[in-house]
C-alpha cells in the first residue's frame, strides 16, 4: 500500500515522542515505504536496537518488508535543540562557507571528521546492509547563520564515506531554527557542490517564504535538482489539504520536469 494521491511514503518520526514510538508506528504501518529520523539517543546503537528497526520494517510482512527510503543521521540531542554536530567537527577556518569542493580523507588524518563520526558512519553502513537504505539526511549543526568552512569540509567527508556503499548525503533547508546556516536552496548550494544532494521539505521552504517551483523550469540536469521531497501543508504543518499550499500542483510540476524520487508525507 502507498499513501493516497501523489505521495509515495510516510515519515513516522515527526509525530512520535520517542524513537521507540516511531519504530512502533513503522511496525504497524500499512504503507510499503517509510522514512525515519534517527530513532536512538546514541550515535552507536546496539546490535539489538538495530535489529528492532529491521523487525519493525518486516512486522506482519516478513516476505516483503517495508522499504526504508531515507534516514536522518544522528544529529545530537534534538529535544535540547541540536540540529547536527558538524559545526563542532575540526578547527574553525573562517565563516565564509569556503571549502566547497574539497575532498577530505578522514582516514589520512584530515581534521574534517572525527573518530566518533567515523564510527557512526560505520553504523550507517551496517544499517544500509540490513535495510537497503541509501539516502541520509545530514544536519550540519547550529553554528550560526553563516555556513562555516569546517561544516562544508565535514559534510564533504561524510558524503565521501557514504558514497563508498552508494549512499547519498542529503542537505535540507530548515525553518524556525535559530543559528542554522541552511534555510534556502541557495544556502544549500555549497554542500551540494561538496558531494551532497538537495532534500526539499515543502513546509520549511513555504515557512521561509521561498518559492521553489522555479526548479521545474531547470530540469533534472540542474545541479540543485532535488533528490528527495517531503511535504506538509502550510500554514500549520498538517496533512495536505489542511493549509493553503498547492502541494499537488508543485509536485506535479516537478514530476513533469523529470523528478523521479520519493514524495514523503512528513506532517503533524
State what each model feature region is.
Residues 31, 130-133, 226, 259-260:
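A structural motif
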Residues 64, 80-197:
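Active-site acidic/histidine proton-transfer and metal-coordination neighborhood
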Residues 1-125, 195-197, 224, 252:
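N-terminal pre-domain/capping segments
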Residues 49-63, 154-162, 214-218, 249-253:
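Catalytic-core regions built around general acid/base machinery
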Amino acid at each position: 500500500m502507498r499513501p493516497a494521491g501523489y505521495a509515495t511514503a510516510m515519515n513516522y518520526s515527526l509525530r512520535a515522542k520517542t524513537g521507540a514510538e516511531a519504530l512502533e508506528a513503522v511496525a504497524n504501518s500499512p504503507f510499503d515505504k517509510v522514512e525515519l529520523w534517527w530513532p536512538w539517543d546514541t550515535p552507536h546503537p546496539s546490535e539489538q536496537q538495530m535489529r528492532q528497526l529491521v523487525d519493525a520494517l518486516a512486522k506482519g510482512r516478513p516476505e516483503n518488508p517495508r522499504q526504508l527510503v531515507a534516514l536522518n543521521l544522528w544529529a545530537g540531542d534534538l529535544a535540547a535543540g541540536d540540529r547536527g554536530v558538524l559545526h563542532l567537527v575540526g578547527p574553525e577556518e573562517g565563516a565564509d562557507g569556503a571549502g566547497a569542493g574539497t575532498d577530505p580523507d578522514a582516514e589520512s588524518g584530515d581534521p574534517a571528521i572525527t573518530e566518533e563520526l567515523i564510527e557512526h558512519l560505520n553504523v550507517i553502513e551496517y544499517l544500509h546492509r540490513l535495510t537497503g537504505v541509501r539516502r541520509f539526511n545530514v544536519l550540519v549543526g547550529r553554528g550560526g547563520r553563516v555556513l562555516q568552512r569546517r561544516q562544508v569540509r565535514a559534510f564533504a567527508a561524510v558524503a565521501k564515506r557514504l558514497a563508498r556503499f552508494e549512499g547519498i548525503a542529503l542537505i535540507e533547508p530548515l525553518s524556525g531554527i535559530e543559528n542554522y546556516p541552511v534555510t534556502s536552496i541557495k544556502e544549500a548550494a555549497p554542500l551540494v557542490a561538496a558531494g551532497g544532494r538537495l532534500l526539499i521539505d515543502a513546509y520549511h521552504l513555504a515557512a521561509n517564504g521561498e518559492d521553489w517551483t522555479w526548479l521545474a523550469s531547470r530540469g533534472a540536469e540542474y545541479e540543485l535538482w532535488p533528490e528527495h521531497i517531503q511535504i506538509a501543508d502550510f500554514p500549520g504543518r498538517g496533512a495536505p489539504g489542511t493549509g493553503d499550499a498547492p502541494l499537488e500542483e508543485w509536485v506535479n510540476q516537478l514530476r513533469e520536469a523529470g523528478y523521479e524520487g520519493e514524495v514523503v508525507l512528513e506532517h503533524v
